[in-house]
C-alpha cells in the first residue's frame, strides 16, 4: 500500500489555525505519486505490481477526466490513457469513508478494487470507518463485506 506524507515544500504550512498540512497534503501527495507512477510509464512497464493507494486515491478520482485530457500528450507512457491505468489500481478507504470521496472513486473503479483501511487514531477506529461506509448508502451488504475483507483476500490469498 502506498501511503502519503506532507511534501517537503508544504510541511510547515498552516492552512488554517489548528490544522496540519496532512489535512490537504496527504491527498495531494497521493495524487502526485499516482501521476508519477502513471506518467513515467511504471504502471505500464510493471503490470504485475498491484498498487493500493491510500485515501481513495486522494484527489485523483475527482480529477481523473481533467488529468486524462492532459495525458493525451503522453501516449508513450500511457498508450491507453491515464484513466485506463487508474482502473488497474486498488484503493483503500482510510480517511475517505464519505460520500464525496467515494462517489468519484466508484465512477472510476468497481467495488472489487476498494479495500478497507483506517487512519487510526485520527481517522477513527475500524468500527467508525465501517459505520461511515455503511452510512454513505453507496454499498450493498455484499459490497461492504467485500470491502471489509474479501477484496483483500483476493489480493493476498495466502492470508485467507
Predicted regions located by residue number:
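Mid-to-C-terminal alpha-helical segments outside catalytic/metal-binding sites
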Residues: 40-41, 49, 59, 90, ...
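Catalytic pocket-lining loop regions of alpha/beta-barrel enzymes
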Residues: 1-115
Amino acid at each position: 500500500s502506498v501511503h502519503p506524507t506532507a511534501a517537503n515544500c508544504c510541511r510547515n504550512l498552516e492552512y488554517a489555525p489548528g490544522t496540519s498540512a496532512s489535512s490537504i497534503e496527504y491527498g495531494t501527495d497521493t495524487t502526485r505519486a499516482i501521476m508519477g507512477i502513471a506518467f513515467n510509464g511504471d504502471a505500464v512497464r510493471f503490470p504485475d505490481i498491484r498498487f493500493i493507494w491510500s485515501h481513495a486515491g486522494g484527489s485523483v478520482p475527482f480529477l481523473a477526466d481533467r488529468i486524462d485530457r492532459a495525458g493525451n500528450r503522453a501516449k508513450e507512457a500511457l498508450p491507453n490513457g491515464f484513466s485506463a491505468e487508474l482502473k488497474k489500481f486498488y484503493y483503500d478507504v482510510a480517511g475517505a469513508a464519505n460520500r464525496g470521496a467515494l462517489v468519484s472513486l466508484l465512477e472510476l473503479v468497481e467495488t472489487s478494487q476498494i479495500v478497507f483501511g483506517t487512519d487510526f487514531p485520527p481517522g477513527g477506529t475500524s468500527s467508525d470507518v465501517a459505520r461511515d461506509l455503511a452510512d454513505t448508502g453507496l454499498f450493498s451488504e455484499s459490497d461492504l463485506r467485500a470491502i471489509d475483507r474479501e477484496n483483500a483476500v483476493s489480493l493476498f490469498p495466502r492470508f485467507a
